Amino acid sequence: MSTAIAQQKIRIRLKAFDRRMLDLSCDKIIETADNTAATAIGPIPLPTKRKIYCVLCSPHVDKDSREHFETRTHRRIIDIYNPSAKTIDALMKLDLPSGVDIEVKL
């Protein structure tokens, strides 16, 4: 039998419409994890979701005249292995932009 050491892991999922803001947030999280002696893996890019909206230009007839609008949701995953209490405190105090949605799983 092999004895496997159970590692603690924090998985952080980030979502944003702006890719640059998302990458800056990922860099801050990884830098914080590295400063507290935790191992950070990532950011792992996930597929970008595109949502396309079709709007009629004319209020009455002319169905051939349409405009298309889209929103793109960029996503990333960061895994932090062997976090200490100092790592968790530093991540809680981290100031990230409001345009980035963050989901943390322990």
UniProtKB/Swiss-Prot annotation:
Database matches in SMART domains: Ribosomal_S10
An annotated GO cellular component: ribonucleoprotein complex
Record's keyword terms, sorted: Ribonucleoprotein, Ribosomal protein
Keyword NADP among UniProt keywords: no
Keyword Cell membrane belongs to the record: no
InterPro entries, A to Z: Ribosomal_uS10 (IPR001848), Ribosomal_uS10_dom (IPR027486), Ribosomal_uS10_dom_sf (IPR036838)
Example GO biological process: translation
Gene3D superfamilies: Ribosomal protein S10 domain
A GO molecular-function descriptor: structural constituent of ribosome
Function: Involved in the binding of tRNA to the ribosomes.
Family note: Belongs to the universal ribosomal protein uS10 family.
NCBIfam families: PRK00596.1, rpsJ_bact
Subunit structure: Part of the 30S ribosomal subunit.
HAMAP family (alphabetical): Ribosomal_uS10 (MF_00508)
Protein name: Small ribosomal subunit protein uS10
